[in-house]
Amino acid sequence: MTAETRIHELRAELDQHNYRYYVLDEPSVPDAEYDRLFNELKALEAEHPHLVTPDSPTQRVGGEALSAFSQVRHEVPMLSLGNAFEETDLREFGRRVVEGLDQPGAVDYSCKPKLDGLAVSLLYRDGQLVQGATRGDGTTGEDISANVRTVRNIPLKLQGEGWPAVLEVRGEVYMSKAGFDRLNAAQAEAGGKTFANPRNAAAGSLRQLDSKITASRPLEFCCYGVGQVSESIGDSHIGVLEQLKAWGMPISRELRHAAGIEECLAYYRDIGERRNSLPYEIDGVVFKVNNLAAQRELGFRAREPRWAIAHKFPAMEELTEVLDVEFQVGRTGAVTPVARLKPVKVAGVTVSNATLHNMDEIARLGLRIGDTVIIRRAGDVIPQVMQVVLERRPDDARPVEVPSACPVCGSQVERTQLVKRSKGKETTSEGAVYRCVGRLACGAQLKQAIIHYVSRRAMDIDGLGEKSVEQLVDEGLIGSPADLYKLAFEQIVGLEGFAEVSSKKLLDAIEASKRPSLARFIYALGIPDVGEETAKVLARSLGSLARVQQALPQVLTYLPDIGLEVAYEIHNFFEDEHNQKVIEQLLASGMKLQDEGELAAEFAASTTLAGMIAKLDIASVGPTGAEKLVAKLDSLEKIIAADGIDLRQALAAKQADAVREFFKDEANQKLARDIEAQLLAFGMHWSCEKKVAEGLPLAGQTWVLTGTLERMSRDIAKDKLESLGAKVAGSVSGKTHCVVAGPGAGSKLAKASELGVKVLDEDAFVTFLAEQGIVV
């Protein structure tokens, strides 16, 4: 037998032993025999180095150290999950799923423990592991290929056959409790750093630049799903996981089906009771709608899937003493109390600070400085004060007082009453917030505003980290975001961290930031409660900064996922004279927003008179009543002028009286007319609806999306089609105009072929969009 033949035999045998040991939990040989085979292979490869291949079991020991990790863009974003902390949260999730699917019978869910580790992506091409990456921010992660190759139960080559040419496997790298204990014991014996908990140990081990260190750590991998795949590998989530297991991927041994939310709750309770006896740390349970077609139908909300949720376990709690309460100043000027605690370990982490949120929370707790309190890590991450232990209160405990002057700049601190709004009306009190009135004259607010403005997801000005921003502010070089565009080379060269080359690069990055998208610019402004997704909705729907600035709160609620609270935050931000001045300065610096344009067509055609009436919050008049009213009185002016007789012909007496009473108030008349006038000015008034719809190229057509699209998500594809006037349906029928089919298309594609419906693959679809002036 040749050395090459024996090497191939040994690799195949060792791969099979690894599969049986790590995936099936059925060891086929004693450890000593495995070690003998491994050492034989290692010796043969040393004698014949030209026969060493990347997928050999001997190549898990690590290679040369890296200087830094390179970035990897996820073709399919690695989204985070929404959380449920109470049974009511999970039941509400179940209700939304049932409502979204509109199907009879219990929904089938997959259930598994939520490992407390680090999410990673493993990319296989033709069965070979070619890349490993961290989750990062969900869009961009770090290339940790060398490190994941050292994790013992990650197959370097897939088992069996039939795997797709491209297969991205996603899962969690973690450290078992036993492995963690062994690692810490070894670290302590060697005089090295010990880790607070298994998650920190796993994360720190996986992100080592020297993969030899990673190889020495007891890391494990558990698969929980897939990302990009070149062809379908199943029609259910559990089916996909079972197929991955057949190809050598370790999956959770606790994976189960559940028929409906009550069975999910039973699973959650069972895992919770066994939590401490499990060989690994978990912080909850993950439930996913099992049927993949149902997942696609439910889709996503912002950066979370609507078909999955993580039900978290209650956090671990400890007692400690409040040594002091200090006040921090945030980006919006909010003065927030923070408890300084006698250090205590909670769930393996030393906690010395805890959030107190606001003064109302301090009042609710009855907290005083010197008190003994119960703290917990909410969601196992953020320390919170839960309760004061009154029987341990010392005689010298002191009440907490809000500073009258800002602890940073000395400006006055004002108390602002918060209110909960209901469709334009101020209702119940939501407590109060204390704010420093110094705005950008306050160093803390200015620094946080600039840090947010230059961040990667905002204006993406490379070279300006927190320390650099603090230095520029402390040196008096910037007093607002607009001052960044006035910086000169001579001002920054020589500052700490800025040599000639880095100074030039920073100025180039600042100049490059003058061409942002509208969404980035809106997000960079730091509007309270406006994150990336909301900024994208504003930009995509309204199309221009001017419309966003002018929009009334009630008009903003017509946009997807924007409620009245957020709408008022947006409106109030742009009404503020100081903010207007900052925006004027930014635009005067040469800022050119790159994608301003018209109102989104689907948004322009989405409003109706009935919808507007329903949003006015007239007592007892909901969407159905509004439809009845508009069927009788087809204009706002007719409704305002209607007497009781006209109104009672459309509505029940109680509703008719409510409408008449509402419009007796001149302020309500003005509000309704202002809303209508703005809708008309924006081109989204119902009188424009027919004209807008008829003028779109796909008006009256029904399209269907199926399979996995690689160049865009299905939600984005749906938005593109709807912007052209098409209706996007979930099933194929004789009325379907066209089907867009990506890899993995199944029954819908077959149905289209059967009915003779036109089918476009993704390339043809992208070409079609380009012909309509839409670039992907």
UniProtKB/Swiss-Prot annotation:
Enzyme kind, highest EC tier: ligase
Binding site for Zn(2+): 406, 409, 436, 442
Cofactor(s) this protein requires: Mg(2+); Mn(2+)
GO molecular function, one term: DNA ligase (NAD+) activity
A single BP term in Gene Ontology: DNA repair
GO cellular component, one term: cytosol
Pfam families with a match to the protein in the record: BRCT, DNA_ligase_aden, DNA_ligase_OB, HHH_2, HHH_5, Nlig-Ia
Enzyme nomenclature, EC number: 6.5.1.2
Record's keyword annotation contains NAD: yes
Coiled coil: none
Protein name: DNA ligase
Natural source organism: Pseudomonas putida (strain GB-1)
